[in-house]
C-alpha cells in the first residue's frame, strides 16, 4: 500500500469529548507502529471548529482536503478518516453522512448503522425485529401528563424503571427511578437531552460486554467480559471514567461455555443484522435465571487505558494494530 494520508478526527464537543481525546491517543500509538501512513490529528471543538494539535484552525472540505485558515499553509489531501468521536456527531452517524457525501472512506460503522444503534428507540425496534431478547420498555415522544401517567403505570407494574434519553450515549440522560416522587423530574430531565425517551424495566442482572469486530473479512465476537458495580448501582458515565470509580471489570466473565456461546451468537446476529462495520461493543444483561437480554450497542466504543474493547480483543488473541491495519487496507486496495 502506497503512502496514505490519514485524518484522525477526535473530540466532537459533546459530553464525551475528553474521552474521545483519550481514545485518539490510543489510535495514534497504534498507527505509529504501521508504516505507510501520514497521520494528521484534528480536534472538533464544541463550537464546531476544527484545529490541529498545533492550534491551526482548519476545515475538511468537499474536495477531501484539510484546508487551513492560514492560507500560507498548503491544503492537506485526505485519503482516509478515523472518526474517533464518541456520542454526537460521531456515533450518531452525522459525520459519516458527510464522508459518504464526498466519497471519503472511513473507519467504523456507516451513517445508517450508527444512527440506528445510537437511538435507543430504533435500536430496540431492531433488536425485537431480529428476534433478540431485550428489556421490556415503552416509548415516549413528549413530556406531558400522558407521558407521566404511562411512566407511573410502568413503575407500578415493574417496581423500578430506567428513564433514558433516546439519543444519548454513555449513560448520559439516564436515571433509575424507584419512587413516584422522583419520576416527573427524571422524565423532564431526560427530555431535556432528547425529544424521545425510553422507559425500561429495571433488570437486576450481571452486566456483560462483547467486543464484536471484523478481522480479515470475518466477524469476531469475543468471550463476554463483565462490569461489576457496587450493590444497587448501575454503570454511569462517572462510574466508567472517574478516578475513584468503585466499578470492577473482568475481561472474561465467569459463566458457562453454553451461556458464553449463546451471547456471542446474539452478538454476531445483531452485528450482521444491523450491518455494523469494523468495531462495536455489544452489552448484555444476564439475569439470575440465566436469561440473556441485549442492552445496547456502542458503534465506536472507548479505547482508553481502562476500556473493555481493546482488552477483550487482546484477550481473544488479536493484536489491535494488526486489526486496525487489516480494516484500513481492505478499504484502500
Swiss-Prot record:
SUPFAM superfamilies in alphabetical order: Glutathione synthetase ATP-binding domain-like, PreATP-grasp domain
MF annotations from Gene Ontology: ATP binding; D-alanine-D-alanine ligase activity; metal ion binding
Pathway given in the UniProt record: Cell wall biogenesis; peptidoglycan biosynthesis
Catalyses which reaction(s): 2 D-alanine + ATP = D-alanyl-D-alanine + ADP + phosphate + H(+)
Residues involved in Mg(2+) 2 binding: 296, 298
UniProt signal peptide: none
EC number(s) from the headed UniProt entry: 6.3.2.4
Positions annotated to bind ATP: 154-209
Superkingdom of origin: Bacteria
UniProt main location, coarse: cytoplasm
Segments forming domain ATP-grasp: 124-329
InterPro entries, alphabetized: ATP-grasp, ATP_grasp_subdomain_1, D-Ala_lig_Van_CS, D_ala_D_ala, Dala_Dala_lig_C, Dala_Dala_lig_N, PreATP-grasp_dom_sf
Gene3D superfamilies for the chain: 3.40.50.20, ATP-grasp fold, A domain (3.30.1490.20), ATP-grasp fold, B domain (3.30.470.20)
One GO term (biological process): regulation of cell shape
Compartments where located: Cytoplasm
Leading EC class: ligase
PROSITE patterns recorded: ATP_GRASP, DALA_DALA_LIGASE_1, DALA_DALA_LIGASE_2
Binding site residues for Mg(2+) 1: 283, 296
Gene Ontology CC: cytosol
Manner of cofactor binding, per the entry note: Binds 2 magnesium or manganese ions per subunit.
Function, as annotated: Cell wall formation.
NCBIfam families linked to this entry: D_ala_D_alaTIGR, PRK01966.1-3, PRK01966.1-4
Similarity comment: Belongs to the D-alanine--D-alanine ligase family.
PANTHER family in the record: D-ALANINE--D-ALANINE LIGASE, D-ALANINE--D-ALANINE LIGASE A
Protein name, entry field: D-alanine--D-alanine ligase
Gene that specifies this protein: ddl
